[in-house]
Amino acid sequence: MKCHIYGYWESGQPSSSSDALLYKLIEEACGECIEFTTSLKDAELVILMPYLSSKIRRWALAQLYFRKNKEATYLLNAIFRIKSHQKVLAVTYENLDHRSWYWFGKLIRQLNIPRLTFWPDVIDSGGCRFPYWWNFVRFENYILSENAYERYGVPLELDRLLSPLDIPNQRIDAVCVLTRHLRWPRDQQLQSLEKNYQVDVYQHGTNRQWDKTKFELLQKYKYAFAAENSIGYGYETEKLPEAWMAGCIPVGHELNPFSDFRKELNQENDRVDDSCFANFGMLNNTPNLTKVVSYISERVFKP
């Protein structure tokens, strides 16, 4: 099946379906291998992502407002030139409650496009929850290329995420912070942490950078900064799983009401009790990929 990603975050298209867990789940749902094409008109399946120009965003919102009584197939063609015979699946790993991405959430909800987002069922019964960090977990039934795990250095192992932390003694007694910026509220979060911890900030473009993988750097530290950039219903990225995988105590984070992570991870004190992390794992259960496959099969590929 020929597939085109509209609004992909990189130039071009993925090299193969082994580049991400998402593509493997789509293949299972449709019962075919997918082949990526740079041609939108040749695609049988269009994966719609939000990384589009401001011009297209404004045009999309204008179409939603002035032609709100039109059918979804009409609007998809008017906005993106997606034809009625093409199958569509919207996928986003962004926080759709944030003002930068709210437009995309409004679009896919209003047009009732089949969608994979952070939103849990209680917020969006028409979509399916698919957190970004699932793409970096090693699942036995889905073999991915090594490139899929390049950003962190190793795959996230479910056994490790389900188990209590085992923290070696010989580690730097400080919080490791990996960040691209120190804009609000990131800077304020770190200032709060500095009242109780030594904080080592690694930031690209500064004198302190990391030349190895994130996993190798985190393994040197006892603590890791795991706060999200923004707050949204069900919005959880890879920060806490990556800290746990490296054997770091996660600090600086707040769990949202619809978290997949254990409620015991909630932090209410100025400084966490290190010993408590030996009593529980980060997760209660393994991610439910069967639910995702069934959703894609029913909403996208069912005649």
Label each region the model flagged.
Residues N279, L283-K302:
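C-terminal "capping" alpha-helix adjacent to the active site of nucleotide-linked donor transferases
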Residues M1-G281:
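Nucleotide-sugar donor-binding catalytic core of glycosyltransferases
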